[in-house]
């Protein structure tokens, strides 16, 4: 630690690593995804070699159910009140006034307070999520319904400029 002090190096824990990866929109397989999530759903379509004539999994990725618009896709969420942190696993609805049982359109996969941004951030799997960016959704919580705006999953340095130092 002393050797790193001139470079502002400090100790950190695993929670800090979780927050940092979420700020950049980096996912944890199995937490932000499940067995139903395809690469395009998780914003990982860039990793597929689409110019190749064939590859393992190509046929599977073309299945109608894997390209349906209503698939659950990974998005970012920002609560209207930045002090309110969503609960991981919380269900998401479009209309909080609908009769019970409510139609759930997704769930929160990761949720943290970002000291860098000075507010809470979350990631969620939402039906047709990529097409809904900018829309407001509702998250029933123990203390009431919380409004959240659908955003990109990259909350901090979305263009990666800080990585290009």
Which residues does each predicted region cover?
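Conserved, structured C-terminal
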Residues: 1-165
């Amino acid at each position: 630690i002393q050797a790193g002090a001139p470079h502002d190096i400090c100790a950190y824990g695993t929670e800090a690593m979780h927050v940092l990866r979420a700020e950049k929109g980096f996912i944890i397989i199995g937490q932000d995804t499940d067995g139903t999530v395809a690469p395009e759903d998780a914003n990982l379509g860039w990793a597929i070699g689409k110019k190749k004539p064939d590859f393992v999994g190509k046929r599977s990725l073309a299945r109608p159910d894997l390209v349906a618009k209503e698939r659950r896709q990974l998005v970012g969420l920002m609560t209207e009140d930045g002090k309110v942190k969503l609960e991981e696993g919380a269900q998401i609805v479009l209309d909080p006034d609908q009769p019970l049982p409510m139609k759930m359109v997704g769930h929160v996969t990761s949720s943290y307070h970002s000291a860098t941004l000075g507010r809470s951030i979350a990631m969620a799997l939402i039906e047709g999520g990529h097409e809904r960016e900018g829309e407001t959704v509702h998250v029933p919580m123990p203390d009431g319904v919380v409004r959240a705006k659908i955003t990109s999953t990259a909350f901090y340095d979305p263009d990666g400029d800080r990585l290009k130092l």
